[in-house]
């Protein structure tokens, strides 16, 4: 993976996860509870998939791109 592509991908992954966090917070406003739980149960796996299949592979090649460092 070329570094410039990794940089651009990381920027997009960070935007994506930020947007998923907005969605997670909005889901907390959903009623009834059954609907909220149905939506919410899918958010964890989506965040995990972003981490496992996007974030970590980029950092494997370019650990210096880790925004948490």
What do these predicted regions represent?
Residues 12, 30-66:
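Short, charge-rich amphipathic interface segments used for partner binding and complex assembly
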